[in-house]
Every structure is written in structure tokens, then in C-alpha cells.
């Protein structure tokens, strides 16, 4: 997100927040990530004005972050995955006070695929569905939040999702919808995280001035394309 934001004339990241025990705390952001100092420093607290929060953190200390966001009352894009139902409900409840956009996956193409899968299954809900996914070996949650969202559309339990964790970069999700007569196979691949960073920044541009409510990628799809 930091790197991609440099390609947007109308977006500036003003706060670079890490937890108080992070190895990046008080280090130069540019030097830490790109080997070139840019005089922007990782901090544990917010020190500059801002319009919207992007949260790509892991679920560790999620309740502390929710408490902070309750105080700030700023629009927030939540991209954290692997949350419990209780944690997700707490995030949804924030929308009573501020705009909240929940997007475990910020790829617009993934959102369009989910919309397509929903329509296909509504047309013929007797078909069987198989979901599989692969991510780099350092990804913590398994199955991915994106795979879980497809499973929810197909009424599949998460134990029915095939998940692989291998390699250093890249990921894919594959959805197969089939019966005895035909099969539809959909696959989305991403070579790195840039597509999700671009997606997050585009979501923020669309979302940060919206009224308090709960928003999803499907909300964005409906607004832009329907």
C-alpha cells in the first residue's frame, strides 16, 4: 500500500502505525521497506491528521484496535482476515458510529467473480461446488478469507475447502461448479500483493466520504456497475 500510494496524486499516507513491540517501531519507513530513507517514521500512535484508516494488520490485538477506532470515529477499511465471528460482529457494530468497509480481499475482479458465482448458484442450486486455494507459506490463516466468502455463497463448510501453503509469493483461488452434464471452472491468480494494495486505495477513494454504514466489495460493485 505504501509503495502503490506513490502512484496516486490524490492520496497521501500520513500515519504509519505498528504495534508497540514491532521491530519497525521508530524506523524510517522508506529505508525499512525500500532501502531509501524518506523521513517518514513508523509510530505506535497516530500523530498526524487523516481522513480514513486502512487496516491490513493480523487479528492479533484486534480488540485493542477496535477500541481505538471507536474513539477516533473515522472511516475504516478493514482487510484483516482470520477473524472469529465475535470479532467480526464487533467490527460490524462500529458502523453504527462511522463508515466501515469490510474487505478480506480488495481485488475488484474477485468481487465480480463472487457476484457471478452467486448468480450461477441462484440459477441452479442443485450443482455441486468445489473450492480450492493456494497462498505463500507465510500466510497465517487457512483457508483464506476469500475462500471462506466463496464457501459462504455455496453453503460449504470451511473443512470442505482445499488449501495449500507453499512458495514465497503469489496466490490463486479456484471455484468449480458442476453436475453430470457440465462444469464451470473459475480461477483468479495474483503474482504479488500489488493488486490488493491498488484495490484498497481505490476503495478508500470511493468510500471515505460515505455516510456511516456497513460496506462490502459487493456494495461497490452494485454502485459502479448495476
Regions found by a protein language model. Give the residues of each.
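Anion (oxyanion) recognition and catalysis
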Residues: 70
Amino acid at each position: 500500500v505504501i509503495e502503490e500510494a506513490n502512484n496516486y496524486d490524490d492520496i497521501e499516507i500520513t500515519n504509519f502505525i505498528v504495534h508497540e513491540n514491532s521491530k519497525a517501531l521508530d524506523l524510517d519507513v522508506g529505508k525499512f521497506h525500500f532501502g531509501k530513507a524518506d523521513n517518514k517514521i513508523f509510530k505506535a500512535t497516530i500523530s498526524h491528521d487523516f481522513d480514513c484508516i486502512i487496516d491490513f494488520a493480523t487479528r492479533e490485538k484486534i480488540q485493542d484496535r477496535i477500541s481505538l477506532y471507536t474513539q477516533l470515529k473515522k472511516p475504516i477499511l478493514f482487510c484483516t482476515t482470520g477473524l472469529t465471528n465475535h470479532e467480526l460482529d464487533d467490527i460490524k457494530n462500529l458502523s453504527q458510529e462511522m463508515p466501515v468497509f469490510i474487505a478480506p480481499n480488495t481485488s475488484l475482479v474477485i468481487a465480480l467473480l463472487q457476484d457471478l458465482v452467486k448468480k450461477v448458484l441462484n440459477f441452479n442450486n442443485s450443482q455441486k461446488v468445489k473450492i480450492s486455494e493456494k497462498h505463500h507459506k507465510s500466510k497465517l490463516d487457512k483457508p483464506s478469507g476469500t475462500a471462506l466468502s466463496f464457501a459462504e455463497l455455496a453453503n460449504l463448510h470451511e473443512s470442505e475447502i482445499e488449501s495449500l501453503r507453499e512458495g514465497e509469493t503469489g496466490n490463486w483461488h479456484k471455484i468449480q461448479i458442476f453436475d453430470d452434464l457440465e462444469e464451470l471452472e473459475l480461477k483468479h491468480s495474483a503474482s504479488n500483493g500489488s493488486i490488493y494494495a491498488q484495490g484498497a486505495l481505490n476503495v478508500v477513494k470511493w468510500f471515505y466520504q460515505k455516510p456511516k454504514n456497513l460496506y462490502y466489495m459487493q456494495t461497490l460493485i452494485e454502485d459502479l456497475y448495476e
